[in-house]
Regions:
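Short, aromatic/His-centered strand-loop micro-motif at the edge of beta-sheets
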Residues: 176-198
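Extracellular glycan-recognition surfaces and repeat-rich motifs
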Residues: 61-99
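Bacterial Sec-dependent N-terminal signal peptides
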Residues: 16-49
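Extracellular beta-strand elements of beta-rich domains used
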Residues: 57, 199, 261-265
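Secretory/extracellular carbohydrate-interaction modules
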Residues: 95-173, 267
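Flexible glycan-contacting loops in extracellular carbohydrate-active proteins
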Residues: 227-261
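Bacterial N-terminal signal peptides
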Residues: 8-17
Length: 268
């Protein structure tokens, strides 16, 4: 498959981000939240004034991967995985990117990331938006689908991660400092196959308090405020900014793929 990449090394800052992530149930933390999702709020329109906008991020051939780094603890068996850019179908604008995993061992995962230009200051608003498509017949295959942006600034890691957990049917966020996934009040309604779904994750950080704030998650035009804060983690690494997608395999190591289109990162 075109543009298949498998790396056994990775810059330290990104490795910090994915160590401990993954779909293995043992990586879960705390008691699942069973309360109903909070009431939705109106979805903001347009980009913030003076914002930087990175468009069609998925179309680049510069996606990187990193072997077993997406597994729990960042170790273990390496799944077969791939990405393919320029897919004419399914697509919304004539070309999408397909991310695929074909594991031979249960609970192995595939992490795909892109290095962007480092952001040398506090992020007052960050929106990671994309459209996602799951083929008919693969809708029960994922253990989880994850996506994130991450800033490393002056040695501090600000990790903005979401996980759609299929067995628990809940949205979770990653606590980078404690290396665990935490439940949120948001119920996860599994993505309907054979159609596009619009996802927007909103974040910001506080570089004085060294905290990460998950502001809201929007699914198919319905915005849910979250307002959950985690501590950043000091790694001592150089300034970086990355975005990522991860596919987690289930207990039967079922292969699957997703397509992503119109991926945009907006920040100021």
């Amino acid at each position: 498959m075109r543009n298949w990449i498998l790396l056994y090394f990775i810059v330290p800052a990104v490795l910090f981000a994915v160590s401990g992530c993954g779909g293995n149930p043992s990586s879960s933390a705390g008691t699942p939240v069973t309360s109903a999702s909070p009431a939705p709020s109106p979805t903001p329109s347009g980009s913030p004034t003076n914002a930087t906008v990175l468009s069609n991020v998925e179309d680049s051939p510069k996606w990187l991967t990193c072997g077993a780094c997406g597994n729990s603890g960042g170790t273990g068996s390496v799944a077969n995985f791939s990405f393919t850019i320029g897919m004419p179908a399914p697509s919304e604008d004539g070309q999408s990117t397909q991310f695929a995993i074909s594991p031979s061992v249960a609970f192995t995962n595939a992490y795909f990331y892109r290095q962007q230009t480092a952001i040398p200051q506090q992020i007052n608003s960050l929106a990671y938006a994309f459209d996602l498509y799951i083929p008919v017949g693969m809708e029960k295959a994922p253990q989880a689908i994850e996506f994130e942006c991450q800033q490393v600034l002056d040695g501090w890691v600000y990790n903005f991660s979401w996980q759609a957990d299929y067995p628990l049917s809940e949205w979770r966020i990653f606590d980078y400092g404690l290396k665990r996934w935490d439940a949120t009040p948001l119920n996860f309604t599994h993505f309907t196959p054979g159609t596009w779904h619009h996802v927007v994750a909103e974040y910001h950080n506080d570089t004085t308090a060294h905290t990460v704030i998950h502001d809201a998650l929007t699914i198919d035009g319905v915005r849910f405020p979250v307002n959950i804060t985690h501590n950043a983690f000091f790694s001592g690494g150089g300034n970086q900014f990355t975005n990522a997608v991860q596919l987690d395999s289930n207990s039967t190591a079922t292969p699957y793929d997703i397509s992503v289109d119109q991926m945009t990162i907006t920040y100021k």
